[in-house]
Structure formats: C-alpha cells, structure tokens
Amino acid sequence: MVSEKTMAERVLALMGRPNNIRNIGIIAHIHHGKTTLTDNLLAGAGMLSEELAGDAMFTWWHEQEREREMTIYGAAVSMVHEYEGDDYLINLIDTPGHVEFGGEVTRAVRAIDGAVVVVDFVDGIMPQTETVLKQALREYVKPVLFINKVDRAIKELQLPPNKIMERLAEIVVGVNDLIERYAPEEFKDKWKVSVQNGTVAFGSALHNWALSVPYMQKTGIGFKQIAEIYNTAADAKEIRRRVWEIAPLYRVVLDMVVRHLPSPKEAQKYRVPKLWHGDLNSKYGKAMLEADPNGPAVAVVTKVIVDKTSKQETAIARVWSGTIRRGMEVWLLNANKKVRLQQVGVFKGIQKIQIEEAKAGNIIAISGVRDLQSGETIVEPEPDGSKPNIPPFEAIKHIFDPVVTKAIEPKDPRDLPKLIEVLKLIQKEDPTLKVEIDQESGQILISGLGDLHLEIVEYRIKNDFKVDIITSNPIVVYRESVKGQAGPVEGKSPNKLNKFYITVEKMPDELYWKLREKLLKGELPEGKIKKMNEDIIKHLMSLGFTREEAQRCKVIYRENMFFDMTRGIIHIGEVIDMVMDAFMQVMDHGPIAWEPCIGLIVKLTDAQLHEDAIHRGPGQVIPAVREAIKLAMKDAGLVLYEPVQVILVDVPPDYIGDVTALINSRRGAILDIQTEEDRALIKAKVPVREMIGFTDTLRSATSGRGVWYLVDQVYEPVPRELFDQIVREIRQRKGLPLDADIV
C-alpha cells in the first residue's frame, strides 16, 4: 500500500491540474459488482492491500451496508492513476443499485462527469441498469461500460468463446439502445459504447481481471490466456494472482476512464448551461464554463454525511469554479446566509485528508458547517462581502416520490426533542426521506420510497442515534384528482364581499407525462413562477398551451398547474399571491381525504373584489378560493389514485406458478413473463398497498430464491369497490369526519 503522506501529496499536486482530473461514478443494478470493482480499483491505486480487495468493501462505511451486502450511501474516494507516463486524479463515487436508494444515485451524478456502467454478464441489463443510466444521461454524464462476472461464463456456464462474444455483443447493443433513448440529442451517437474503440471492457471484479481491445492490442494478452488460467489453476487464490499478473482490472478500467471520460475542463462546457440557469456571460458563468480556478468560487453540495457519535456533518461538494479555501466565508444561496468553511478535505474512503484549498473541478469534503443541505449552492461573496445576485444550481430531482408513510414516536416522551433533531440530521443525508409533523395531532410522519427505505431509517434512529422508537404500520400515500372538467364555480369570502370564479380540469395523460419529464429535467420551475421568461413560455407551449395561457401560468406545484386568466380586474395584483397560496393548500390537502392532488389544471377566470384592502385580506381570499377549487373538483368528478409499482420478479422457472398466484392474490396484474434455462423474469403491476411485506412473502414462497426489483411507479384509480373503504380508513386515521364533505 502507498503511504498516506505520499498519496496525499500526489492528490494535492493533481488538484490544480483540471485536465488531469476525472470525476466518475460507478453505477449499476443491485449486486452487479460495483463495490467489489471499486475495491479493486483502490487496490490498484495502492490504497488497499490486494489481499483485502473485494472482501474489504472499502467504501461501505455504514454497518447496515455490510449486513445487507449492498451499497446504501454513495461514498466518495480520491485516488491517483498513472496513464501513458502522466498522473491522473480519479475522484470516484460508489452508488447504490437498489431502487429505494435511487436518491443517492441522483445526487451522486450531479457531482460527476463520467460513469462506469457495470452490467452482470449473466443477468444482462436489468431494471435498475436502465434507471441509473437514465439518471446519469439526464445530468449530462458520459458513460463507459464494464461487463462484470465473465468468470461465470468460463467456470460455471462453460460457454465456448463464440457464445461469450455473442453475449457481450448483446449487452453492448442493449446499453446503446438505452443511450439512444435517454442521452441528450447532441450526444446520442457520440456517447454510444463500442468494443472496438475501447469504451467497453469486460472481466471479473471478483477475480480482479479485465480486458479491452486497446489493452489486448497493446499487450497481446487475450481471452485465451485468461481461460487457460481458469482451467489450470488449483484454486480461486491462484486464479486471482495469475490473472492479476497479466490483465490487472484497475489498469484496464482506469485506462478506459482516463482515455474516454471527460475532464472537468471539457465536461463543464456542456454541463453548466444545462444545470445552471444563470447568465453564462457573467463572471460566474464564464468561470464555471472554463473551470477557472482564478474566478469566483462556486460549489454545489451533493451529499451530507452525519457522524453517528459526534453528530458532526460533512458535506460532499463539487467545486465548479474558483478556489474553496479552509476558513473562507461563503454565501449559501438557498439558505440565504453567510457561513465560514471550517475544514476542507478530500476523501480516502471514509477517512478525510485535510487540505488548505481545492480548485475548480474537484470533489471535496467540507466540515464544520451546520447549514449545508444536499443541493445547496455555495458562492464566494462579492468584494464588499454582499451576496452575489445569481441563481443557485437547479434543484436535484428524484425519479420517484415517497409512497409509504409511518407514524413515529419516542418510547420515552422525554426523547421527543432528540428524535426531531435526529430526523432533521437523517433528512439532510437523505432528502428523499420526507418528515412531517401534523400541526393538529403533533404526530410525526416519515415517508419513504418503500418498506426497506423506512426500515433502514428506523434502524439508524435506534442503533446510530440511540433513540428508542415506536412506529405504526406502513401507510400508503394516495393522490386525489378529477375525471373531467367543471366550472366556473363561485367561491365567496366569509364576509361575502369578494367572489372568485374557478374552473378545474383533469390534465390529459400525455400532457401530464411531458410536464413530469420537464420538471425532472429542470426545464420548468416547481412552485410559484416568480419571473416569467421566454424559455419557460416556450417549454409550456411545447406542452400544448397557447402563448397567452403560457404567459398566464402562475404556479406549477405537485404536478398541478394554476393559471390566472382574468382580464381587467382592479386590485387582482394585490390578491393573486393569496390565490396561489389557496391553490397550493388544496393541492396539499384535497377534498376527498386530505391527500395531495395530482394532474389538475386550475384556472381563475373572473373575480369581484372589494375596493377596500381591509376587506380582502388572507382571511377572506384564501377560504373563498379554496372553497371554489374544492367545489369545482367535486363537480368535475372526484377520483382517488393509488400508487402502483411496476416490478420485475426474478425466480427459478419452477416457481412461476407460485409467484403469479402471489401477485394475483395482491390485486396484481402480470404484464410479461420471460423464461430462460435457469430463471424466469415476471413483470407485473401491484398496488403499493398490497406490496407491504411482499419481500418476506416472496422469499417464503420461493424458498428464498426469488428477488424483485422496482421498474416504475405510476398512479391508477382506486377500484370502485374499494373506494369507500379506503377513504373511510384514511379519514379515520386523520381524525376527519367520516361521511361529511371536506370543503
């Protein structure tokens, strides 16, 4: 192993050479070998002994990860690789493959410019491969491909070389189909991977070898020599030693990374315009486009880690321009406050090496600041110390919404303040976790992406932060909407001196999906539109709205839209903000069961306002608009939607009957069944309400041999025969009237 001092010195020397930096992530489906690959890359860079690689799981910094044998939290590590006589700094982030931790992938891809996509030779492309690659491409991250577990083809499946080549070609075609589908238009062809040009490598992370065409051409080492070692070696240890000598994995993969993935200098030219919507001709825009270390400092936090004993927070951040220095004062644009950066460091796995400064293009660790959140933009103050007038980077978007909620309380009521503090800390680390305190009942609700997500949060509260808790059974989050359209419906203020006229209609499905995609890409803002501009108008018109409608769009909230279509109403400008607040309140709590609304277009078409401002304050305007929206929704035909998960179940063929019966017993529908010799893939749709406890039931139905993966999440109307029962359950739980209308 290289001594820490030597490694630290080499890292520091390279931090000022942006052309020699590669910020990369390893992304893949769960259990396809990402973390083992990471360990072997570290061993090759001299940061982990070769004997330990693969067993050490260097980036698994949380005991939950070791127990479950999967990466939950994206860890960061810096290492040095020599290529063609020059040193390169590789900043690497290991990301989870389990879909319930997809938020970690979303945040990690903001920090990186390139990704090594790992695909299992036997499994091929799986649902999460598609999800994580889609997330990376959406953030303008360039991929290369590593096909792992080729050792299984030789030892286990005993495939002849021509069959192995056929399978490799199949995987390459599949990955390129995904790149064609999800890559930005200008990179659809440029970013396709190819065995010939060296953007594809294949090998075994377990046995620590890899091959690529450039490596084979350079060394004369080929598949034949590897197969020979497998056929003659006495045991796995001998295989590892001998293949390492002729085709070391780290050299082949990191050579591919250096040669084919972009430096920050190159990547920021096309990434900054997509991720930051400020003036590219300003001093900030120019500095970020060039990754200029002498420009004003701008960095973005992509993750916050909380130490379970000291509660100290460490933020992982990408420096986009300028130089971040220890002890410097900076502005946090989202939090709107000035703070001092106490410590700056780089990661060596879990360990931090303290440094004095970090220049543009680097991934760093910042400690000693309590107000950093994932997605925060850090900016150097203006020369007079004031806050720069620039927008923050666009918010980091997550593909799936939280759909499962639990009520949580401390066993000992005296631990309540501690529990609230712990939840705030965990939420900083994991923004996909939603924490709400019901203002009326005082009940604390935590919402996550599924059963497993909440289980891990509970484990951390109990074991890391030592708070004993009681949790309720999981509760599913529903959505409210309408069947058709209605209005204008009148809403009167309590003093009867103001009237508002509202129409409500269901968003057409095609429009809804296009809107969702634009929100995920950051092309449209979420919330009140503070400043309408030509870009927003164009994106709204591309959804099918007229120019006039687009100009009058005031709010996009929870995938619902609000338009002010009034003309010539005196004083409307003074109350429109309250009208928007009322709209957002109803979108948070709909009329059926106080669940959030989805897919609605709400328009204010007319209003009659009292001339005296004292008679049209929030206490008059907000109830009137709320009433009008809820009555219009009722007239348009109320619908309750439930979250439905599209899943893929992977089982031996003998269990197809048991699994289809299990899915059918949970109101599921089979969409597709594909069978191979030793496995069957069953694609199905199952309501989230019925998915609770599914993992354990599947395990017992298949003698522990069945696993399932989340492919997608959609909302579908609750069946008519269950509507009354579900509404009653929700209302009862929330302490709402069981039969009366909630308006």
Curated annotation (Swiss-Prot):
SUPFAM superfamilies: EF-G C-terminal domain-like (SSF54980), P-loop containing nucleoside triphosphate hydrolases (SSF52540), Ribosomal protein S5 domain 2-like (SSF54211), Translation proteins (SSF50447). It comes from the Archaea. InterPro entries: EFG_II, EFG_III/V, EFG_V-like, EFTu-like_2, P-loop_NTPase, Ribosomal_Su5_D2-typ_SF, Ribsml_uS5_D2-typ_fold_subgr, Small_GTP-bd. GTP binds at residues 28-35, 94-98, 148-151. The keyword Nucleotide-binding applies. It is found in: Cytoplasm. CDD domains: aeEF2_snRNP_like_IV (cd01681), EF2 (cd01885), EF2_II (cd16268), EF2_snRNP_III (cd16261), Elongation_Factor_C (cd01514). The keyword Cell inner membrane does not apply. GO terms for molecular function: GTP binding; GTPase activity; translation elongation factor activity. Residues 19-265 form the tr-type G domain. Keywords: Cytoplasm, Elongation factor, GTP-binding, Nucleotide-binding, Protein biosynthesis. One of its GO terms (cellular component) is ribonucleoprotein complex. The modification Diphthamide is found at residue 615. Gene3D superfamilies: 3.30.230.10, 3.30.70.240, Elongation Factor G (Translational Gtpase), domain 3, P-loop containing nucleotide triphosphate hydrolases, Translation factors. PANTHER family: ELONGATION FACTOR-LIKE GTPASE 1, TRANSLATION ELONGATION FACTOR-RELATED. Belongs to the TRAFAC class translation factor GTPase superfamily. Classic translation factor GTPase family. EF-G/EF-2 subfamily. Catalyzes the GTP-dependent ribosomal translocation step during translation elongation. During this step, the ribosome changes from the pre-translocational (PRE) to the post-translocational (POST) state as the newly formed A-site-bound peptidyl-tRNA and P-site-bound deacylated tRNA move to the P and E sites, respectively. Catalyzes the coordinated movement of the two tRNA molecules, the mRNA and conformational changes in the ribosome. HAMAP family: EF_G_EF_2_A (MF_00054_A). This is Elongation factor 2. It comes from Nanoarchaeum equitans (strain Kin4-M).
